[in-house]
Amino acid sequence: MSKAMNADNPEPATKSVAAIAPSLKAEILAEALPYIRKFHGKTIVVKYGGNAMTEEKLKHGFARDVILLKLVGMNPVVVHGGGPQIDEALKKVGKVGTFIQGMRVTDEETMEVVEWVLGGEVQQDIVMLINQYGGQAVGLTGKDGGLIRAKRLQMPDRENPGTFIDIGYVGDIEAINPAVVKALQDDAFIPVISPIGFSDDGQAYNINADVVAGKMAEILKAEKLVMMTNIPGVMDKKGNLLTDLSAREIEELFADGTISGGMLPKISSALDAAKSGVHSVHIIDGRIEHSLLLEILTEQAFGTMIRSH
């Protein structure tokens, strides 16, 4: 059964770790030890998006957090979004982003923008920061090593069952070849994946980053999938945080419209990952500094846990 947490104040508790008392820091480090043992050698897929990608302090904190996970023996794989950056780039060419059921309508010009923003600007920024702090990150798109093979998405028209909506060059994942990711992991690198897929004839497709993260977690047999967002987690219609959701409860939230817009692909992908065998799937508030470490290395209840049963 879902547990609701009151969210009268939707702003995150952005207390910096630097402000925590030394004794509490020691407790946190001691608390992390069993989790470090538990997840040693395990793959952790992180969907990186929202404010954590645009606020400088959070960006630098995320880079350090990912490096720490690698240093203590885990295998983090980062799948990044970049919606705000794409919107900003589209404005410069006189276009406005349009979304249907949480998916960006992608014409030919928009696809070109998506490719150079995600596969270039955003990816390079993440890789640079991780490497700047002493990590070894390598950026990938779906073309590298045949990582993500995609076809044009057929989006069902909910108002006209049996028909489909054309949303352009939006991709549906046909297959993921994890060989290049596993090779990088074996050589102590941190893969940073842009959600761009390619068809056999070389056509690029814009794929929702949540969808890529969920499928990547499934194919890599990840221990955990953590999705970072701009909200505390899944909220009910009264603004309360739902800390634990089963498959049945998620279907009810879809049906009554509680989950809508950009949350649709996010929750669908999270649930699919849980059903596929990913042991732990969480949606967390990326606006909280070091939220990734708090989720993985402490007992602190955080965000929304997605269960397959």
UniProtKB/Swiss-Prot annotation:
Instruction: Give the superkingdom in one word.
Output: Bacteria
Which Pfam families does this one have?
AA_kinase
Q: Which GO terms describe its molecular function?
A: acetylglutamate kinase activity; ATP binding
The EC number(s) this enzyme carries: 2.7.2.8
Compartment(s) of residence: Cytoplasm
Where is this protein chiefly located?
A: cytoplasm
Residues carrying the site annotation Transition state stabilizer:
47, 266
A Gene Ontology annotation in the biological process aspect, one of them, is:
L-arginine biosynthetic process
Q: What does this protein do?
A: Catalyzes the ATP-dependent phosphorylation of N-acetyl-L-glutamate.
**Sequence similarity:** Belongs to the acetylglutamate kinase family. ArgB subfamily.
Protein name from the UniProt record: Acetylglutamate kinase
Q: Which organism is it from?
A: Cupriavidus metallidurans (strain ATCC 43123 / DSM 2839 / NBRC 102507 / CH34) (Ralstonia metallidurans)
